[in-house]
Amino acid sequence: MIETDKLAAERIIAATPVSPNEEAFERALRPRQLEEYVGQEKVRGQLEIFIEAAKRRSESLDHVLLFGPPGLGKTTLAHIIAREMGVNLRQTSGPVLERAGDLAALLTNLEANDVLFIDEIHRLSPVVEEILYPALEDYQIDIMIGEGPAARSVKLDLQPFTLVGATTRAGMLTNPLRDRFGIVARLEFYNAEELARIVTRSASLLNAQIHPDGAFEIAKRARGTPRIANRLLRRVRDFAEVKADGNITAQVADAALKMLDVDAVGFDLMDRKLLEAILHKFDGGPVGVDNLAAAIGEERDTIEDVLEPYLIQQGFLQRTPRGRVATLLTYRHFGLAAPDSSSGLPGLWDSAAT
């Protein structure tokens, strides 16, 4: 798992932050209000109504669960919610809250209607989660004082607050925890037009000269993810300052991204290595993941957790009962003629069932 995390951190098209410097860079570019937030129109519209209603009633906003792939703006939305409500935000993450006392200390220090943001909430320990249930429902927590026979339970009242939980794996949340969120929002991948608007806004904040076609060139290679779009913009800006007097056109962006091994659909060297192995070493598949891992010299976890998700989501790779299969899109992307067998992919499933 360590190797998987290391590879994800090294890829320029990774959806997770790659360094503390990048996290600071992201904070500087974050929109501060809902009206500045680009994309996720449905989620944004819902939050506008719920926040305004809570403010008119002078109540805390209902608890919010944000889920979806990394890099789509869950943390940004948590900060915006607190700012729109005019309250403080306390931020932590599931793995950090190891003991019940850690959570109790946070909850007892919240002021009225404050927002508590827990990232990776699916990684809360069961002990901490048990403390959270009464806090979410009744704004109370039970803590144990003393040890052994003299131990006793004390009930503490809390100020009304809003929990904003973020997760990339909603399926790992327990049902009791999931049921306590009144507002549940899934963040989707962005289209190229939305990402181009984000790139243009970020370039303005960075005082970078960018043409609309340059912004779109970056956007269409950003894998539907604002975090990747902003990271690519930083690298393209560096290239433009050295090679093009700081002027980012489509041609400059294309040259910069080719230098970074990011192709027209956002694939990097590892994506292409995996797909080309399936095409050339295994005749398009099906191939088992262990054989594929050996062929490209990567760990199985790296393939399943880092490389495959985007390829499958975009329709370039298919998982079948017999293994991984390259799709027609993959053949077209590499300029290859698809064999007749690839047009009969359902047959793979049929043969597996017999």
Swiss-Prot record:
SMART domains cross-referenced by the UniProt entry: AAA (SM00382)
Location of the region described as Head domain (RuvB-H) in the Swiss-Prot/TrEMBL record: 264-354
UniProt xrefs under Gene3D superfamilies: 1.10.8.60, P-loop containing nucleotide triphosphate hydrolases, Winged helix-like DNA-binding domain superfamily/Winged helix DNA-binding domain
Keywords: ATP-binding, Cytoplasm, DNA damage, DNA recombination, DNA repair, DNA-binding, Hydrolase, Nucleotide-binding
Primary subcellular site in the record, as a coarse category: cytoplasm
Chain sites annotated for binding DNA: R300, R319, R324
Residue positions binding ATP: L29, R30, G71, K74, T75, T76, E137, D138, Y139, R180, Y190, R227
Domain of life (superkingdom): Bacteria
Top EC category: hydrolase
GO molecular function ontology, one term from the record: ATP binding
Its EC number(s): 3.6.4.-
Stretches for region Large ATPase domain (RuvB-L): 4-190
Annotated Pfam families: AAA_lid_4, RuvB_C, RuvB_N
Catalytic function, reaction form: ATP + H2O = ADP + phosphate + H(+)
NCBIfam families: PRK00080.1 (NF000868), ruvB (TIGR00635)
Domain notes: Has 3 domains, the large (RuvB-L) and small ATPase (RuvB-S) domains and the C-terminal head (RuvB-H) domain. The head domain binds DNA, while the ATPase domains jointly bind ATP, ADP or are empty depending on the state of the subunit in the translocation cycle. During a single DNA translocation step the structure of each domain remains the same, but their relative positions change.
Subunit comment: Homohexamer. Forms an RuvA(8)-RuvB(12)-Holliday junction (HJ) complex. HJ DNA is sandwiched between 2 RuvA tetramers; dsDNA enters through RuvA and exits via RuvB. An RuvB hexamer assembles on each DNA strand where it exits the tetramer. Each RuvB hexamer is contacted by two RuvA subunits (via domain III) on 2 adjacent RuvB subunits; this complex drives branch migration. In the full resolvosome a probable DNA-RuvA(4)-RuvB(12)-RuvC(2) complex forms which resolves the HJ.
Assigned protein family: Belongs to the RuvB family.
The protein's name: Holliday junction branch migration complex subunit RuvB
Source organism of the structure: Paraburkholderia phytofirmans (strain DSM 17436 / LMG 22146 / PsJN)
Gene that encodes it: ruvB
